[in-house]
Amino acid sequence: MWRVLFLLSGLGGLWMDSNFDSLPVQITVPEKIRSIIKEEIESQVSYKIVIEGKPYTANLMQKNFLSHNFRVYSYNGTGIMKPLDQDFQNFCHYQGYIEGYPKSVAMVSTCTGLRGLLQFENVSYGIEPLESSVGFEHVIYQVKHKKADVSLYNEKDIESRDLSFKLQSIEPQKDFAKYIEMHVVVEKQLYNHMGSGTTVVTQKIFQLIGLTNAIFVSLNITVILSSLELWIDENKIATTGDAKELLHTFLRWKRSYLVLRPHDVAFLLVYREKSNYVGATFQGKMCDANYAGGVLLHPRTISLESLAVILAQLLSLSMGIPYDDINQCQCSAAVCIMNPEAIHFSGVKIFSNCSIEDFAHFISKQKSQCLHNQPRLDPFFKQQAVCGNAKLEAGEECDCGTQQNCFLLGAKCCDTATCRFKAGSNCAEGPCCENCLFMSQERVCRPSFDECDLPEYCNGTSASCPENHFIQTGHPCGPNQWVCIDGVCMNGDKQCMDTFGGEAEFGPTECYSYLNSKTDVSGNCGIGDSGYTQCEADNLQCGKLICKYAGEFLLQIPRATIIYANISGHLCVAVEFASDHEDSHKMWIKDGTSCGSNKVCKNQRCVSSSYLGYDCTTDKCNHRGVCNNKKHCHCSASYLPPDCSVQSDTSPGGSIDSGNFPLVAVPARLPERRHMENVYHSKPMRWPLFLFIPFFIIFCVLIAIMVKVHFQRKKWRTEDYSTDEQPESESEPKG
């Protein structure tokens, strides 16, 4: 059963004046007072930090949560994913406590100064380096909700006991340790919100994972960041819609594109200006490859501390740990982590007795097997390429492993000594590499798997296949009754066959009108807190999936209740799954299924299909192609992009994105100026100005010459006149 996290009260932001007090920023200079060094790394360290005029000692132990082969990935201009060459460290992240305060947690990174969070029982302080400081100055600020009247402990609150410093006391027990390997995807809007830079965004994700690890200490769980993916230029899937819809879309993408990326669970982090939801995941599906994932929505008013609480709650739900019943579940902190209100509280948060019991039950089952695998966590100062380790790293063209491994693999393109291509080779592996050479443009590297999907071709200059493209969402498919949604024809008949087998088809209107109007197990428009949701008349075909069954035998579906009804001569069937059944989503009509003329289903309601944003007209591609998800024409065979207006008998069809054409196709004739402006967004015509300038200069020169000639002629006439008069004057008699 999928679970959606709600913000149960009005969202308040840690930095919003309307909901939070104006908090003063203090300047402090942390002082390192002791440390323990193992293998050239500070495994444990203590800092004295002054807060509000009083010194506190933070005892920290190195906490490594990056896998040994951790990479940050992004996409280049052609849509090919590449690892980023970044200089980051995994040995400078620490976790610990404030000396003298047993209910405290410190999570600090020392990579570039001290950056992190100091949590007391019911108040938190953020610390980070002061930019442009000539000393070791840091800013420290209290994360304080306006409604919370909290402060640091007074001296009387400290337990009367020996407060002598023992670094070894913070060493965690390694018995029964569990590990969650997580792949994180940051979509474009959140990337921009976090700073629009790979380094700053990566550091904030490190902080988020560090804070999350501090929460899971009591369960002896380490969240390992196995890889990070940044969608810098564009999102690879649509990130609109509610949390449930986005979760299903992301999981479909995950199953296609993260198959070869090692991880237990994948999370998509999405920015929303405001949202009533903060995330969604499937409960108890942490180790199920098809459902191990979630989406985390980051409203503008949520701080990084609250975001870590949300992530911890989502991961807990994935491990079968539900929300606490506050009347029966207790913990020693001011608020327990699985309390829905926990995101509104500062300070330490731990798991309740109920959560610990639920976690113990989960790890005792076979479905928790992925948590028992301990990944390699070797410290690294910088990602150094190691030739011969069978991993393609920065600066390498290929790496098939040792010479013996390369021989066994039949790798003949890679020089095992230099990890460079051998002479005459331009690739070593990949869907578009054959015999050490790039495949030609006409070779299909990813065939279409659905009538709404599109094939991709090798581009002749890369061993990789172009990113996946599909017909624009909203395009009609099937017998013009259904529409394409994210590359899949949302065919009602196929939904029925997937649920009830090949002898089922989409039910007639009579079946939907009768069963979905009953508002019970046989038909409804969803399940809410108060029970089944009634279908309004317009929404009858968007509730429970009702199919027409023509088989001779009774249906057999494990852990399911089959509902049969004979309506107007049709044998109509529906199904009811338990809430935690992995196929429970099959009970409902899928979003995007047609429910009338220019209408589709969305969240069990029949709405206008305009929300899909389909704007591809038949004229755009000259009736010889379809628009893809980038709104570019994918032409039929024998026609050329970009607008399918030019015929070529040898063309297999395609688009400027499919790989078998250059990014800007050159047609045999120029398209109309109107089309050129639509495609390239040309600026208003300015060329007459550039032609006018030389003519203006020539004109000015001619004017200058004419003026000069005019005055020269005038001078000549004056001189001639003076010459004629002078002899007459000189002939007059003297005297």
Curated annotation (Swiss-Prot):
Q: What is its main location?
A: membrane
| Pro-peptide region(s) | 17-174
Q: In which tissues is it expressed?
A: Expressed specifically in testis.
Q: Which residues carry this modification: Phosphoserine?
A: S729
Q: Which PROSITE patterns match?
A: ADAM_MEPRO (PS50215), DISINTEGRIN_1 (PS00427), DISINTEGRIN_2 (PS50214), EGF_3 (PS50026)
Please give the InterPro entries that the UniProt record associates with this protein: ADAM_Cys-rich, Disintegrin_CS, Disintegrin_dom, Disintegrin_dom_sf, EGF-like_dom, MetalloPept_cat_dom_sf, Peptidase_M12B, Peptidase_M12B_N
What name is this protein filed under? Disintegrin and metalloproteinase domain-containing protein 2
